[in-house]
Amino acid sequence: MSMLLGVRGTRDQSSYIGGRDYVFWQKEMRDAERIPGPTPLPVVGNLFDIDLEHVLQSVIGLANKYGPLFQITINGEKQIFATSQALVDELCDESRFHKAVASGLENLRMLAHDGLFTAYHGERGWGIAHRILVPAFGPLRIQSMFDDMGDLAQQLCLKWARQGASNSINITDDFTRLTLDTIALCTMDFRLNSFYNNDTMHPFVESMLYVLREADVQSALPGIANSVRIMAHRRMLKNIEAMRTIARDIIHDRRKKENPADDLLNTLLNGRDPVTGEGMSDESIIDNVITFLVAGHETTSGLLSFTFYYLVQHPDILKKAQKEVDETVGQAQISVQHLAELPYIDAILKESLRMMPTAPGFTVTPKKAETLGGKWLLNAGQPINVLLPACLRDRSIFGPNADEFSPGRMLAENFSKLPPNSWKPFGNGERSCIGRAFAWQEAQLVVAMILQNFDLVPDDPSYTLRIKETLTIKPDGFRVRATLRHRQTATGLFQHTLSARNDTSLASSSAHFIKKSEDQAPAGGRPICFFYGSNSGTCKALAHRLASDLMPYGFTDQKLAVLDTAVDNLPRDQPVIILTTTYDGQPTDDAKKFVAWLESGKVPALQGISYAVFGCGHHDWTQTFYRIPTLIDELMHKAGATRLAPRGTANAAVSDLFSDLEAWEETSLLPALRETFLLSSSSDLEPLNLHQLQISLSKPRRIDLHKDLMEARVTTVRILTNPDTPEKRHIEFRFQGDTTLRPGDHVNVLPVNPPSTVLRVLAQFNLAPDYSITINSFNTLGLPQATPVSASELFSAYVELSQPATRNNLRILAATAQSDEDKQELIHLQDSYDSLVRDKRVSVLDLLEQFPSVSLPIAAFISMLPALRLRTYSLSLAPSFKPSHGSLTFSVVNEPARNGNRRYLGVGSNYLASLTPGSILYLSPRPAKEAFHLPVDQSRIPIIMICAGSGLAPFLSFIQDRMIWQQQDKPLARALLFFGCGGRFLDDLYHEELSEFEAAGVVDVRRAYSKVLDYDMARGCKYVQDRLVAEANAIRHLWAQDATIYVCGSADMAKGVEGVLEKLLGMLPRERYVTEIYQMQTRDNVSEWLI
C-alpha cells in the first residue's frame, strides 16, 4: 500500500511558468486554500501518523478525519491524497492529468523497467508494447481463452472436492495458485502446475511476494534507512533475477516449439508496432512477461478472495447467487455464453471491488499547474494519489450504507446511473488495466463454478477481516470449508470437459473470417465499401463477417480498410458500412484521423454518400458507451450523407457480437440495401449465406493442407478379438522419417470418412464419385481453393460428415424446407437441440435424409461442414523395442446409431481398419503429458498400470521398454499390470506377448474378465476395480515404495478405479497418480485420448 507513500516527484513532466501566466499563477497561489492534513514533525514528518504494517488503514483513517483532499509529509516530500468522487472525476481528465510512476511502483522498475504497468508517461517502449498488445486482449481473443480458464478452475474445484468438507481451505493461497496458473496457460501456453505443489507456492510467487513487499517497505522508509539495508537490497536483487530467469525460461521454451500457440506470448515475440514497424526487444519481452504474470494474477486472486469473504459473511446473498447459477446453468457445463446471463454474479464482483479494490490506488500528476476542486492549487509534476478505498465509499455517491456490502447497487440499471468516474478499480484512461476483460471473465467463471458445485461456510465463524498489504491487498488468515452440492462425489465431478462453445466458436469464427484478403476480392459484382476502427481486431472480424454475408446479394466487388483511409475518400457510388468502437472514450488508433476530420468542420459536403454504422461497446463504460459510433453517425448525417439504416449496436458485456451483427443485418441493413440499391428478387431468395461457395467441375487432387504430417507405411495388421465380441485391431507401420517418441506418446492420424457415409452424400446430391469440384470462395473454410478435386475425395478426405449439426445449421435447413411440416419439425429441433440433436449426434447429412423437402444447395452443405480433424491414438510399440516403427491398438466403432436404424461408424477406427500392408497413412508424432511417461529411475520406482480394453496400448509400450532395460542388465523395480476385458478367448489382448514378458520378470499381470467370471486367471473378478481390491496388499506394498500409478481407459472405468484406490491408499497425489481418459463421448473412436 505504500505505493502511495514516499513519492519523490516524477520524471514525466517538468513545467516552466513565465510571463503573463506567471502573474495569474501568483494570484492563484494567493487565493488557493491550504491542503489540510496532520502537522508534520521535524525530520520524520508524519511517519508516526502511519502504521507501516497497516498503511492502508492508517491513510483511510486520515481521509475520514481531514476530508476529500489531504496531505502528509513522508521522507521530506508532501503526499497528496484525493478521496472523493468529485475530485477523482477531475483527476481522471486525461487532458489535464496523466499517470505518475512513483514510490513503490517506481521501485518495481528494477524488476519490470518500462513494462506496461511501470513505464513512465510517454516512454517510447510503453507505446510500442501497448500498440502491439492491445489486439491480444480483444473480446474474441479473451473468449477463446475460456476453455483453458475452465481447465484450471476445474483443478481448483477437484482439489477442494477431494480434500473433503472438513478441510480448512486457505482460500487466498488457492486463488493465487489458480490465477497465476491461468495467466501463464492462457497467455503463454505454459503450465506452472501450482496445484500439484500443495505445500509450497511456485518459486515465481515466492520471489514476487518478497519483491512486492520490499518495494513497499523501501518506499515508506527514509533514504538513509534504505541505504543501510544492504542484505535486504541484495535479497531483492536475487529474487528479481529469479523472476526474470523464469520469464526467460518461458520465452526459451516457446522459441523451441515448431508450432507455437497464437497467444499473447506469440504476440510479444513476433508482433510489430503498427506505427513504427518495430518489434519488441528481448528485454522488453521479459519485462512484459513479468508484468503479466504479476499483474495478471495478483489483483484477481485478491478480488476472488474478498468476494468469497463477503459471500460467506452474507449467506442470503450467497444463496441468491447460487440460485442465479442454478437457474441459468443448472448442473450443465458452464459455457462462455452463460457468463453474460449471470448479472447478479457480475454485480457481486463489482461490489466486492468497490468495498475492497485490490489495487487500492493510482497516481496522477498535472500536465501544468491546475486548480483542483476550485480551491486547491497543484503544481505541474506534483503526484496526487487517488485513494480508491475512500473514493469508492463516498457517501454522496453510494449513500449512507456505503460501508455495507450490497450487490444490488451494482446491477446494470443502477450502475449506469452512477456519476462519471465513480468506480475506477482498474485505473484510468490509456494507462488503465489492459487485461480487465481477461480478469473479469476469469473471475465470473470461477465464482460461477464454485457456487454451482459447493456450499461454503467460514472455517472460523468469529473471523474478523484482516488485510494483508503489499502493493496490493488481500484478506489475511481467511479460511473456508467447502461441501459438494447436489449429492456429487469428488470422482463424479466434471465428467465432461468445459466448453467455451455452444454451437460455434466466436474466436474461431473471427479467425476464419479474418483470413480474407484486404486487397483482393471477387470482382464483377456490386461495389460496397467496409471501413472499420479496431484496436483489438473485433470490429475488423465483424467487418469481414458482414462482407462475407453480403456476397450472396451480389456485393462481390468489396473493399475492406481501416477508417483512417476514408479521410477525403468516401465513395459515392456504393454503400459505405462503418464498424467501430470506443477505446477509453476515444476513437481506436486506426480511426483517430477520420474522427478528427469529421470534427474539424472542414469536411466537404457528403451528399450522395450512403452509409450505415454498426458500433460495439461494453456497458460498464457508462459515460462513453457507443460514443464514437454515435459521433460518427451524427457527424456524417449532419454533413449531408444519407443514413441507410439506423445505427446497429452490440454490447460485449451481455451478448454474442456476431449474433447482434446478424440481427442488425437482417432487420435493418438488408431491407435498406434492397430498397436503395434495388436488389433483385433472385438475390432475395438467398438470405442465409447459401452460395458463398462457387462451384465448377474440374480435375481431382489429394490432401496436403495439414502441417507436420509425415508418411508411414503399414507393415502388419491383425484382428485381436473373437468374432463374437466388439472388434479390436492391431496395426503396425514404419515411419518414413525421424521421430523423438517415447513410450506412452501418441500420434495424430489423418483419416478419411467411411466409404458408405461418402456414398450417402453422393446419393443425396446426385453426384457421381468421379465428378470434379472446384471451390472458388472468398473464404477458405479450410478447403482447397481454385483446385479441382473429385466429389468422392472431397467428402472422404476434407470434411467431417458425422459432426452434429449446429443450431445455425438447423435454422438454415428450416428456412429452405419446402414442407411446412418439415419446417416446424426443424424449428422444434432447435428448441430441443441438446437432447434431440447434439446428444444423439444427428449430422446435417442425417437431417437432409430425414427431411427430404429441404432444398439445400451443395455449396451451402459444404460450407456447413467442419474440416476433417486429426485423430489421436496412443502408441502401443516402444521406439526402443522396434526402432523406426510404431503400432496402434484400437477398437473399431461400428454400432447402432443413437438417432435411427443406421450404423454409427467411427471415422478414425474404420479408416485404420481398412488399411492393409503396404498402405500409406499420414500422421504426426504427439508427446503425451510429461507425467504419463515411465519413471526416470526404473530401477527404484515401481509402477502400477491399470487399464481396460484398448487402454492397454500405452502400457504395452511401457512393458516393451522395460524389457529392453532388463536386456541391458539394468535392475528393474516391480511392475503390476491390471487389465480388464471380456474373457480369455474373447478379447484378452496380446495374451501370448504378455505371458512372455511375465516369464521374463518384466511385469506381473492381474486380469479381470467381465463375461467369463469362472476363469481362474481372473480369480472371479469382473472388473479391474474388483481385482484391485483383491490385490490390495500388493498395491499397498508398492505404494509404500513410492510407486507411480497409471490409469488408461474410459471415464467410467477411471472414476471407479480412483474410488477404489482412494479407499485403499487415501489421498492420491497427482504426481504419483496419472490418468489418460479416452473419449467415449464422441463415439467416434474409443482410442482417442483426452489429454
Curated annotation (Swiss-Prot):
<keyword id="KW-0285">Flavoprotein</keyword>
<dbReference type="GO" id="GO:0020037">
    <property type="term" value="F:heme binding"/>
</dbReference>
<dbReference type="InterPro" id="IPR008254">
    <property type="entry name" value="Flavodoxin/NO_synth"/>
</dbReference>
<dbReference type="InterPro" id="IPR023173">
    <property type="entry name" value="NADPH_Cyt_P450_Rdtase_alpha"/>
</dbReference>
<dbReference type="InterPro" id="IPR017927">
    <property type="entry name" value="FAD-bd_FR_type"/>
</dbReference>
<dbReference type="InterPro" id="IPR023206">
    <property type="entry name" value="Bifunctional_P450_P450_red"/>
</dbReference>
<feature type="binding site">
    <location>
        <begin position="613"/>
        <end position="645"/>
    </location>
    <ligand>
        <name>FMN</name>
    </ligand>
</feature>
<keyword id="KW-0249">Electron transport</keyword>
<dbReference type="InterPro" id="IPR036396">
    <property type="entry name" value="Cyt_P450_sf"/>
</dbReference>
<dbReference type="GO" id="GO:0010181">
    <property type="term" value="F:FMN binding"/>
</dbReference>
<feature type="domain" description="FAD-binding FR-type">
    <location>
        <begin position="707"/>
        <end position="935"/>
    </location>
</feature>
<keyword id="KW-0521">NADP</keyword>
<dbReference type="Pfam" id="PF00067">
    <property type="entry name" value="p450"/>
</dbReference>
<keyword id="KW-0503">Monooxygenase</keyword>
<dbReference type="GO" id="GO:0050660">
    <property type="term" value="F:flavin adenine dinucleotide binding"/>
</dbReference>
<dbReference type="InterPro" id="IPR003097">
    <property type="entry name" value="CysJ-like_FAD-binding"/>
</dbReference>
<dbReference type="InterPro" id="IPR002401">
    <property type="entry name" value="Cyt_P450_E_grp-I"/>
</dbReference>
<dbReference type="GO" id="GO:0070330">
    <property type="term" value="F:aromatase activity"/>
</dbReference>
<feature type="binding site">
    <location>
        <begin position="534"/>
        <end position="538"/>
    </location>
    <ligand>
        <name>FMN</name>
    </ligand>
</feature>
<dbReference type="GO" id="GO:0005829">
    <property type="term" value="C:cytosol"/>
</dbReference>
<keyword id="KW-0813">Transport</keyword>
<dbReference type="InterPro" id="IPR001433">
    <property type="entry name" value="OxRdtase_FAD/NAD-bd"/>
</dbReference>
<keyword id="KW-0560">Oxidoreductase</keyword>
<protein>
    <recommendedName>
        <fullName>Self-sufficient cytochrome P450 monooxygenase CYP505E1</fullName>
        <ecNumber>1.14.14.1</ecNumber>
        <ecNumber>1.6.2.4</ecNumber>
    </recommendedName>
</protein>
<comment type="function">
    <text>Self-sufficient cytochrome P450 monooxygenase that catalyzes the regioselective in-chain hydroxylation of alkanes, fatty alcohols, and fatty acids at the omega-7 position. Performs hydroxylation of C10-C16 n-alkanes and C12 and C14 fatty alcohols; and thereby enables the one step biocatalytic synthesis of rare alcohols such as 5-dodecanol and 7-tetradecanol. Converts 1-dodecanol into 1,5-dodecanediol as major product with very little sub-terminally hydroxylated products with the 1,4-dodecanediol and 1,6-dodecanediol more abundant.</text>
</comment>
<keyword id="KW-0288">FMN</keyword>
<dbReference type="Pfam" id="PF00258">
    <property type="entry name" value="Flavodoxin_1"/>
</dbReference>
<keyword id="KW-0479">Metal-binding</keyword>
<dbReference type="GO" id="GO:0005506">
    <property type="term" value="F:iron ion binding"/>
</dbReference>
<dbReference type="InterPro" id="IPR001128">
    <property type="entry name" value="Cyt_P450"/>
</dbReference>
<feature type="domain" description="Flavodoxin-like">
    <location>
        <begin position="528"/>
        <end position="669"/>
    </location>
</feature>
<dbReference type="Pfam" id="PF00667">
    <property type="entry name" value="FAD_binding_1"/>
</dbReference>
<dbReference type="Pfam" id="PF00175">
    <property type="entry name" value="NAD_binding_1"/>
</dbReference>
<dbReference type="InterPro" id="IPR017938">
    <property type="entry name" value="Riboflavin_synthase-like_b-brl"/>
</dbReference>
<dbReference type="InterPro" id="IPR029039">
    <property type="entry name" value="Flavoprotein-like_sf"/>
</dbReference>
<dbReference type="InterPro" id="IPR039261">
    <property type="entry name" value="FNR_nucleotide-bd"/>
</dbReference>
<comment type="similarity">
    <text>In the N-terminal section; belongs to the cytochrome P450 family.</text>
</comment>
<dbReference type="InterPro" id="IPR017972">
    <property type="entry name" value="Cyt_P450_CS"/>
</dbReference>
<dbReference type="GO" id="GO:0003958">
    <property type="term" value="F:NADPH-hemoprotein reductase activity"/>
</dbReference>
<feature type="binding site" description="axial binding residue">
    <location>
        <position position="433"/>
    </location>
    <ligand>
        <name>heme</name>
    </ligand>
</feature>
<keyword id="KW-0349">Heme</keyword>
<keyword id="KW-0408">Iron</keyword>
